[in-house]
């Protein structure tokens, strides 16, 4: 039996058992203790197994960290990363946050992952990521799965009133002096029902959407506590929003 054949049999044993002793290897391969230890050492050096006292164990394959496939192709990705980082700094330990769907929402959830905050979401890609990363406190809002948005929606919207947060972070397809616009009516209507039970509403809108109208009006400008946007946002619209009491943070 060649060395390569011995190595393959040893690895097959580990794949089945997870752990083998030097004695197991000697008996299975009919080789001397010195040869068994030498084979284990070589496979350990090549990273194919982990050498332990009196034997070897299989290397546990870590699950790849989940992230949306197209996240880095999202429009204005770098700006959205800055927006998410700034938003995460608003939240204090022990507080709860509602995070809705979209690329900026995912980036924000990623920033908050591992911090002592409760994250409430109906966005399944974010929920999956948080669970995969073992975030301590995740609440997934119930309802019917909406494939196009990768979210859950309560058909009557009544369940959303059960959830309350210190902060609600949301985005949209446009923001003007009139307010924040969203294009998906079902999503917008479900989120609207939560506006009365959250402490502060923060709009996360990249600069390309400032001054744009698209879809339905989700919230009036005077309902928005803070806007976090990019430095290239339309200054005229920002002034109009500030005049209505919206706090502006440009990043």
UniProtKB/Swiss-Prot annotation:
Residues 3-58 form the HTH deoR-type domain. It is found in: Cytoplasm. GO terms for molecular function: DNA binding; DNA-binding transcription factor activity. InterPro entries: Carb_Metab_HTH_regulators (IPR050313), DeoR-like_C (IPR014036), DeoR_HTH (IPR001034), NagB/RpiA_transferase-like (IPR037171), Tscrpt_reg_HTH_DeoR_CS (IPR018356), Tscrpt_reg_HTH_UlaR (IPR023711), WH-like_DNA-bd_sf (IPR036388), WH_DNA-bd_sf (IPR036390). Residues 20-39 bind DNA. Keywords: Cytoplasm, DNA-binding, Repressor, Transcription, Transcription regulation. Its main location: cytoplasm. One of its GO terms (biological process) is negative regulation of DNA-templated transcription. GO terms for cellular component: cytoplasm. It holds the Pfam family DeoRC. HAMAP family: HTH_type_UlaR. Represses ulaG and the ulaABCDEF operon. This is HTH-type transcriptional regulator UlaR. It comes from Salmonella arizonae (strain ATCC BAA-731 / CDC346-86 / RSK2980).
